[in-house]
């Protein structure tokens, strides 16, 4: 019985990671991030308030795939970009993954935008260590729409936004662990690229990141 369970988990993780590998190329993640930011800004009633974007110290954008039945596997990739004195930094590759319990039949793809509201949050990502949402840093579902424009100071270090199958929903990411993908950074920049060096602006963003920087520069 134990062998069957082990084989099931292995197969489950394999299928989830196989889907994740579709997004393994960092340029794909960068291009996808552009589309995600645009989608999260389309409808005023469900959009991330411009004020939240303007005050953001950094922005993380992820595409996460969940697959399985009873036991579910989750894997996702994306990028995080920090605000500098001269604009926005280049992107740093990130990823997440794990197992969960509960009814999860088939495959579900979700998009997430995480707003980093504090310098402490940026520093946590800059160190290149694993970041646990709601653990290392307080996280809350972010405000949406025009009514949130008048919001005062952020209520958490991180604001999270999610979109699944075309529907915007407030989904807590508490407990999610996000890790730096060092190999993807090195391949994208053509040399070892530590998150802190990317966020400081010391490493020039590749030309492929320009469209993402242009979209974010509106805020």
Q: Where are the model-predicted features located?
A:
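C-terminal segment of classical bacterial N-terminal signal peptides
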Residues: 13-21
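Bacterial N-terminal signal peptides that target proteins for export
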Residues: 1-8
